[in-house]
Amino acid sequence: MNNIYCIRHGWSDHNEAFLKSDYDEKVFESKKYKKSRLTEKGIIQARLLNDNWDEKNNIDIILCSPMERCLDTANIIFGNNCEINVLECLREFPAGLHWCNYRSSLVELVQSYPNIKTIDVPNEYIDSYFDPKKFESRNNLKKRVNKFKNYLKSYNNKNIAVISHCQFLSEFLNKDFESIKHCYPYKINF
């Protein structure tokens, strides 16, 4: 049995724009928010978790989405010297049409985050997701979550931090997505 701590990334550019637009989903389709990054508010959220979450010192493994906002959140919570294991299956839903969910290439990620220990992502982002006829379905998300659950079975008696996104964590935790807070460690046993 593992202790899994699921953490949504800190507040990001696209979250702020969505709020300011009175919740207009067209924000997510704007290239202005491509590779959405943490805002000052998101940085503060991650620092507060770093300062106030005692369990962070007991984490054995950090699993993280390949999105910069998640990697930055992990580095703030656990320090820039922490070893991060990056998994493509932890990215946000939907992959496609939402530019804020576009990620850097494998080469860019490794260059920008030298503390990545392992990385399980294709070299290039799957551009076909940005074809309106091919973007990721809810069923694809469920398959990713199941793949991740199977992956977690390879660990035993570990404390694992999972840094991911609202929709992915909502599906994984079986919680309403609107209840998933930024930089809050939801603990489950798995």
Language model regions located:
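A generic secondary-structure signal
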Residues: 48-52, 112, 147-151
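Short, solvent-exposed loop/turn segments at secondary-structure junctions
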Residues: 10-13, 67-70, 90-92, 126, ...
